[in-house]
From Swiss-Prot:
Key word Cell inner membrane present: no
Matching PANTHER family: CYTIDYLATE KINASE, CYTIDYLATE KINASE/PANTOATE-BETA-ALANINE LIGASE
Protein's UniProt name: Cytidylate kinase
Catalytic activity: CMP + ATP = CDP + ADP; dCMP + ATP = dCDP + ADP
Binding residue positions for ATP: 9-17
Record carries keyword Zinc: no
Localization (cell): Cytoplasm
Amino acid sequence: MHCKIAIDGPAGSGKTTVAKLIAQKLGIDYLDTGAMYRIVGLYLHSIGVEPKSTSIKDILEKVNIEYIGKDYYLNGKKVGDEIRTPEAGMFASQYAANPEVREFLTKIQKQICSNRSIVAEGRDIGTVVMPDATVKIFLVASPEVRARRRYEELKSKNMEVSYEELLRQIEERDKNDSNRDVAPLVKAPDAIEIDTSNLSIEEVVEKILDIVKERCRIK
């Protein structure tokens, strides 16, 4: 039996760190779908295409995104940390509201998640990409906590950032992600919500692992 784990939640809720650790501890594949939206958003912005442009579908037909090992490739070129900036996150949110972008990436994500045990994280994993997931988790935390986490993460990478600006961006992304017409950020009816505001990463991971071991019958 394949063990499929969906981890959804807003920006800065800890999805990426938690999902990576769970995949590592279980020895199964990991997919960061948010990275794909960052890749596409940054690319489309770089070539001057607006988020609501009617030409996006034609452009995406010539775009090739691959996930090999633990790395992403855009048109044959390995993608680096440029997709981890706050600006790339904003582009991801803006272009994700375009139905053509979501259709393009959802198709790729569904293919990656099929016929394997995997931990996939994003904003619509449990509702759209992997509705048949064995375990669905929805992580939440206050905007202030999420902004602080993102601030510390980016500072550790020697990026010049402002906490106030990150908080503003997170609140804007929450609004965009929750209110978009296509695949908005919503908790799946059968997802288990975990508030990570006052929990360490290790505590969140252990909580989820307990659920996974029971649902996936892992000893």
